[in-house]
Regions:
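C-terminal, charged low-complexity interaction regions
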Residues: 74-147
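Extended aliphatic helical segments
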Residues: 14-17, 32, 43, 47, ...
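Basic, glycine-/proline-tolerant helical and adjacent loop/strand elements
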Residues: 1-50
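Long amphipathic alpha-helical segments
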Residues: 33-101
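Surface-exposed beta-strand edges and their flanking turn/coil or helix-capping segments
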Residues: 16-23, 55-58, 133
């Protein structure tokens, strides 16, 4: 299986605010809270591709304050393995773009040392993205070329 990862640095709603105006209440590589915008948890969105490929998008879920706090409290604990998160995709994922932005998503931890994986959705398109195989050229051609 060939694998490739693409990570979004920030959730789209945070990235849309000019850097000098962003007020991050707290955050890091996996958890971010932005004053007046919301709380976000980094998750992995796996996409199966033709030819035995897989791509994982390091994307963000917009979550409630309660969900963010619960996640933060369990992040480095043994109970992290039992963590399930509900939220909404906070990035436009290529090639589907804004059609996935705001899609309801459920994520679950697979391994103690990994980010939670998106495992389900009530959104029809996101459910298809998770369950179907996609032409690898259509997806990988949307990735930025490494310089």
């Amino acid at each position: 299986m060939h694998e490739r990862d693409l990570r979004f640095k920030l959730p789209d709603p945070v990235f849309a605010v000019p850097e000098q105006q962003r007020e991050l209440s707290w955050g890091g590589d996996a958890l971010v809270a932005a004053r007046g915008i919301g709380q976000f948890i980094r998750v992995l969105l796996p996409v199966r591709l033709s030819g035995g490929y897989e791509v994982r998008y390091g994307t963000w879920l917009s979550v409630s304050e309660k969900e963010a706090r619960r996640t933060w409290e369990t992040w480095d604990q043994a109970s992290y393995l039992d963590l399930e998160i509900s939220g909404f995709l906070a990035n436009a994922i290529p090639p589907w773009g804004k059609a996935l932005l705001g899609a309801q998503a459920r994520a679950r931890v697979r391994k103690q040392d990994e980010l939670p994986y998106v495992v389900g959705s009530s959104n029809e398109l996101l459910a298809r993205v998770l369950s179907e195989e996609w032409p690898h050229e259509d997806v990988l051609d949307t990735f930025p070329n490494p310089a």
